[in-house]
Amino acid sequence: MKILLNLCLQKTNFSFYNYSNPKPETRNLQIMDTTDKKLLALLQQDTKKTTKELSVKLNLSVTAVYERIKKLEREGIIDKYVALLNRTKIDKSFVVFCHIKLIQHTKEFLTTFEHQVVKLEEVLECFHVSGDYDYILKICVKDMEAYREFMVTKLTTLQHIGSTHSTFMIGEVKNTTAFTL
């Protein structure tokens, strides 16, 4: 029986994955095949493509594409679908990277700052980092005057900020949301 099972496995190219002890960072990569990766590349370029259009590009049935997308959503590989806006068209073309240093590194200060900063609509991204500063914020506003207003009335009113250092974008060299798989 064991020999027959091994022959069947070799003929069909099945491979088994040990789900009892997966490494979290590699588990999702192992459940994706080449077609999944191609599908994700296409979706990262344009999520408005229909399953029919995707099926033609991938040489799959519409149902197969639909099922693959649902699987990738269930697995959390596809996190969400969004519309990417043109900053210039919505008067948010002034981009600032603001480095924040807190007065202390206690859990209370970090947590308080994080709870407060996520409420600021001008802050698009916030990263807790190592090095000379504790956080880097990506802020998009209309212009320098709007940034000054933001700094004076919102950012510097947050608790536990020791210092800030702002860097302004001169030009955009690369800006992508697409991962290479």
Predicted regions and their residues:
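A compositional/biophysical signature of low hydrophobicity enriched in polar/charged and small residues
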Residues: 2-181
